[in-house]
Amino acid sequence: MNEREFLNLVAKESSFLIAAHEMKTPLSIIRQLSLTLNDDDTEISDDERSRILRQIDITSERALRLVQDLTKISKLEDAMFELEPINSKKICCDVVSEISDVFKLHNRVIRFKNVRKNELIVANYELLRSVLMNFSDNALYSSNEKTEVEIKVSNVGEKVRISVRDFGDELPLSIWRAVKKQNHQPVQASSRPQSSGLGIFIAQSFATAMGAKIGVIRHRNGSTFYIDLNRSGQLSLL
């Protein structure tokens, strides 16, 4: 085994360990909530029981989504993910609709900043949806309670940018540097034990497969993750 093969093996093992760490969090939450429901010594109201069951459901969906994204990554080289014109406003609204319940459960709000013009972009719907879901998931755990996370579409030169802005803790330098260097490996951040950066790694991999590029802007009161996509020459009729 030469040095390059050894380094690749170490990188793959590191990615596996970080992925396992990311999976551990939702599974631990599900286990703890299940124990609470089954504890005969703990009195739980009907409303609290409904809330716990909803949290188990949402947490399970997050874990399943993570597994599905990792499966897609393993097939990126072999599978053909077709690129097509996609309405940027529609996919943003779809993501907000899908993840809003998760934000409500954590006393947070996510909204789409409406735009007059519907930009058509060239992308794969499922891959782009996963990118935006991972950006939103990252924003959920880094934003402060009772703050709004905002998804926005804007024009940047010849590209269309979809960004997710959160208001909370400053982005760890380890994740910021990894994105800036286009480092296609998950990065663990000690200041965010609940988020290993695996979602950003997934977003980066999917963006590359679509010929797009992700980036991040650090703010004193949060961060903005974005993806720059090619604009479609086809006119939007919506």
PLM segments and residue spans:
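Short conserved segments within the C-terminal catalytic ATPase subdomain
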Residues: 102-112
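Short alpha-helical segment of the dimerization/phosphotransfer core of two-component systems
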Residues: 58-63
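Conserved micro-motifs of the catalytic ATP-binding
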Residues: 77-82, 120-123
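Short conserved segment of the HATPase_c
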Residues: 171-185
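Short helix-loop "hinge" at the ATP-lid/N-box region of the Bergerat-fold HATPase_c
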Residues: 138-140
